[in-house]
Every structure is written in C-alpha cells, then in structure tokens.
Amino acid sequence: MSNNGVDIQDKPPAPPMRNTSTMIGAGSKDTGTLNHGSKPLPPNPEEKKKKDRFYRSILPGDKTNKKREKERPEISLPSDFEHTIHVGFDAVTGEFTGMPEQWARLLQTSNITKSEQKKNPQAVLDVLEFYNSKKTSNSKKYMSFTDKSAEDYNSSNTLNVKTVSETPAVPPVSEDDEDDDDDATPPPVIAPRPEHTKSVYTRSVIEPLPVTPTRDVATSPISPTENNTTPPDALTRNTEKQKKKPKMSDEEILEKLRSIVSVGDPKKKYTPFEKIGQGASGTVYTAMDVATGQEVAIKQMNLQQQPKKELIINEILVMRENKNPNIVNYLDSYLVGDELWVVMEYLAGGSLTDVVTETCMDEGQIAAVCRECLQALEFLHSNQVIHRDIKSDNILLGMDGSVKLTDFGFCAQITPEQSKRSTMVGTPYWMAPEVVTRKAYGPKVDIWSLGIMAIEMIEGEPPYLNENPLRALYLIATNGTPELQNPEKLSAIFRDFLQCCLEMDVEKRGSAKELLQHQFLKIAKPLSSLTPLMHAAKEATKNNH
C-alpha cells in the first residue's frame, strides 16, 4: 500500500511526544486551573506603578499632576550613605522580628514552611532580599530574538547572622521608599502561566553584589529569661558604599558604536525583509545576503528607546570577538538613522525549549545536545567569558540538527585578576547555588545550568518550576542537587554525568573540558536525529494555537 508512491512502511516512526503538553493553547479552558506555583515570576510592582503614573499624566484634563510636577523640588540622589536593617529571628517561636512589611507579605505567600524558615533563616533572608530588592529597573538582552525582560537589582548588600541580647528595632525607612502607598500594595500575584510555558517567559535577573561579601554566622546557646522569652538572632543587612563606573553619555555611546559598526546601506546588502518578531527592544526580520545567499536574522533597535545602551556595546563586542561553530554568530551591524541594525546567523529550527516541552528526547539525543553546548562553553571559558544564562531558550537549532548557544546579554568577561564574579545573574530556576547564596563564582555556574537544562530535556521543565518562585530560590540555596522524578529510568552513565554537572562543591564540579571526555557523550546520536523532533515540536505548537 503506498501514498504518492512512498511505501508507508518505509516511513520512520514519529518521535515520542509528551503525554501532557507543557504548552497550553490560548483558548484552553484549563488555564485558570493551573497550579499557581507553575507560573513565571510575578510582574514587578514598581513597573506597574510607573505605568500607572504615566497613564495618569497623559489623561486629558488631569492638570493636578502637571501642577504637582512644577511644585516638586529637585532632589539629588543620596551619596555616601550607609543603611542598616536589623531583622531578628526568634529560634523558639520560629518568627522573624523587625522584618519589613513587604518582605513579611512575600514570605507569607511563598510556601516556605515554618520548619524550613527555622532550619535556615539566613537562606530565607537571602532569597527575600534578592527577590524583593527595591532598586529595580528593566534591562534587556538586546541581541536575543525573543522578547525577554530582566530585573536589574542595583543593591549592594550583605546579610550577616549574629547573636544579640536584645530585640532589634524596626528597620529604618529605606532611602528609596518614596511612595507612601508602598505598604498598601499587596504582594504580587503570580500570573497565569503563558501558553508557551517555558523558560523564555521566566525572567532573567541581574543583581550587583559586594566585591568582598561577608557571611558570618555566629551561634551561641540561648538561655531563657525571667519572662521566658528568647533573645532573637539578629540578621543585619548593611548597604555599603560601592564604587560605580561612570555612565557613558549618549554621545559617547554613539561614538563607540560608530567605531564598531560597518559603513554602508544594509538595505542593499540584504533583501527581502520578512518580519518574524517584535519585542520591547526592537523588531526582528529575516533576510537574504544578496552576495552569498545566506539567510540571516536582523534586529532593528531604536537607540532612543533603549534604557541601557552600554549593554548593547558589551554584547556586540563579546559576540564579535568570540566566534565558534557552536555559537549563534554575530555577522555585522549598521547605524541607520536612529536605529542600530544587528545581523546574526539565522537558525530556522527555533529554540530547544519547544523540543523539550513537546517531545520526549532519548539519551542519545540529549548527549548530542550536551556535547555541542559543552563545546561552546569550553570555547567561551577558555576565552575568560562566562555566559551566565544557560537554559533551553538560549539554545537555537538548525533544521540540519546544528546546536548553537545564543543570547550574550548577561555574559561576563573575567580577567586573571578577577577570576571570580559576584553578581547575581541568570534565570532563577537555572541558577547555581553559589549564585543564589550570593557568593563569588566562576565559569562553573554555566556547568550547573547545563545540568539543569539536561533535566529539562528529560522531564520537560527545570526542577522547582511548579514551586512558588521564592520557595524555588530557597530550595536551590538549601537543597543543592535537585532530585529527578524517575532516576531509575536513566542509565548509570547519564546519572553520573548529571552528578558531575550538579555537584554542590564547585571544586568537584566538572569543567567543560573535563565533561567533554565523559563517557555519556560517547552515546551521542548524529545531530540529524534532532530534525524529526523539531518538525514534531513545530506541528504541536501549531496545533496548540
């Protein structure tokens, strides 16, 4: 029996699909019944307030806002200040004292149990401070071809646990608590999980940390007092002075860009332009290089609308200097009027995220992806570059099965003098424990994230994605290596590979170079074995819309 001359029996079997798709169509009736824990990080309440203020200011007839703006005096930013918050923890009652109200509300809805809080109050404060930092502003990873947002935490904080003999006072008002309605704002509601569920919709975050973070934990026996009350441990948060690099002016940024970009008219070099995406930081098109016939992706960004233009320069320079077969390579860039055009390789297979959420990968296919990613990481690490945001969304696939690492918005260049970074960067569910616990770190944070991504390929999502985001951070900080749902289904060499990636002790964790010699990679299938998975994922995605 044949169909258009092709024997049906000769067709390869369809790739195995996940029984329960982790994508939910826009019209699905079940979207409202999702476990709230399986949703992305909540929207930034500060951002909502900014939008509300903006809309009020442009509403017709609202003259009070304009009048208030005129009357408001100009106040310069504070400088050379030190801000201390004292938070106590009563080991007997298991309660925090002196905790800022906003933190207390978040903790109340975090699903972190009382016993967990009592077990590790320091970790609770670490994740609260990270999650709820007041000084937030949006930043973008400009070269990525999906619209991702980032929260930029500009605090410089250390948390120290010390034993004191008296109940600490209520913390002083933070210098950035300008709005009186802050305390009235309820804790952010965790938004419904989007129809494409995946890491592309979870936020990446960046938070500068102190150059020399201190974490002194002093424990002493607690004796009951006459009133049978126990002096709480004080958890002290010190905001220290931090030297900041002077910001580049718009003119300096333009001057630097002019020295980087090519001269000429890209509209003559590339044609035709087909729009494939629109994001807050720009519009993405595909086009053909007239001279070579190569299909490319072109991102057009209006520079006036970019809040952190210096990040664009950093990203272009890193991509330009680090070309590799396993990296989505930067090809060219142009200044066209007020726009910056960045030309990149185009991979039609989409991101690995679609494959892991819609299909079931076997160990040979997972090994092939891990090998290609490790080759990219070995190259970057040997050039003193840490990617810092490894996850399935940042792995792009070609229809031939090629696997390439992309999105260098948060990459870091390290020097021999600065072999460790101390910045909280990445996407929370993929973060290494040393990042969540605010320690200095090195290139092996990428190896941990690769291990989490391998779990994505097994289970369709990273560990703790179904947990409240705050509790997920707590679990990463305290549990360390996550447990697999069905470890018995994996081969011994795959389990060993995962253990090498997800080793809590950074010194024992494998490097990219070492892991490329691991036995697990020897079972890798040809890259062409990924092509049927991409076709199946695209078909499933189409059916879910």
UniProtKB/Swiss-Prot annotation:
One of its GO terms (biological process) is regulation of trans-synaptic signaling by endocannabinoid, modulating synaptic transmission. GO terms for molecular function: ATP binding; collagen binding; gamma-tubulin binding; protein kinase activity; protein serine kinase activity; protein serine/threonine kinase activity. Keywords: Acetylation, Allosteric enzyme, Apoptosis, ATP-binding, Cell junction, Cell membrane, Cell projection, Chromosome, Cytoplasm, Cytoskeleton, Exocytosis, Kinase, Membrane, Nucleotide-binding, Nucleus, Phosphoprotein, Serine/threonine-protein kinase, Transferase. SMART domains: PBD (SM00285), S_TKc (SM00220). Phosphorylation of Thr-84 by OXSR1 inhibits activation. Activated by binding small G proteins. Binding of GTP-bound CDC42 or RAC1 to the autoregulatory region releases monomers from the autoinhibited dimer, and enables activation by phosphorylation of Thr-423. The modification Phosphoserine is found at S21, S57, S115, S144, S149, S174, S199, S204, S220, S223. Residues 70-140 are annotated as: Autoregulatory region. It holds the Pfam family PBD. Residues 152-166, 220-231 have a biased composition (Polar residues). Residues 75-88 form the CRIB domain. Residues 270-521 form the Protein kinase domain. Its cofactor is Mg(2+). It is found in: Cytoplasm; Cell junction, Focal adhesion; Cell projection, Lamellipodium; Cell membrane. Residues 1-75, 150-198, 210-250 are annotated as: Disordered. Its EC number is 2.7.11.1. Its main location: cytoplasm. The keyword Nucleotide-binding applies. It comes from the Eukaryota. Residues 174-184 have a biased composition (Acidic residues). The keyword Transcription regulation does not apply. Protein kinase involved in intracellular signaling pathways downstream of integrins and receptor-type kinases that plays an important role in cytoskeleton dynamics, in cell adhesion, migration, proliferation, apoptosis, mitosis, and in vesicle-mediated transport processes. Can directly phosphorylate BAD and protects cells against apoptosis. Activated by interaction with CDC42 and RAC1. Functions as a GTPase effector that links the Rho-related GTPases CDC42 and RAC1 to the JNK MAP kinase pathway. Phosphorylates and activates MAP2K1, and thereby mediates activation of downstream MAP kinases. Homodimer in its autoinhibited state. Active as monomer. Interacts with GIT1. Component of cytoplasmic complexes, which also contains PXN, ARHGEF7 and GIT1. Interacts with NISCH. Interacts with DVL1; mediates the formation of a DVL1, MUSK and PAK1 ternary complex involved in AChR clustering. Binds to the caspase-cleaved p110 isoform of CDC2L1 and CDC2L2, p110C, but not the full-length proteins. Interacts with ARHGEF7. Interacts tightly with GTP-bound but not GDP-bound CDC42/P21 and RAC1. Interacts with SCRIB. Interacts with PDPK1. Interacts (via kinase domain) with RAF1. This is Serine/threonine-protein kinase PAK 1. It comes from Mus musculus (Mouse). The lineage of its organism: Eukaryota, Metazoa, Chordata, Craniata, Vertebrata.
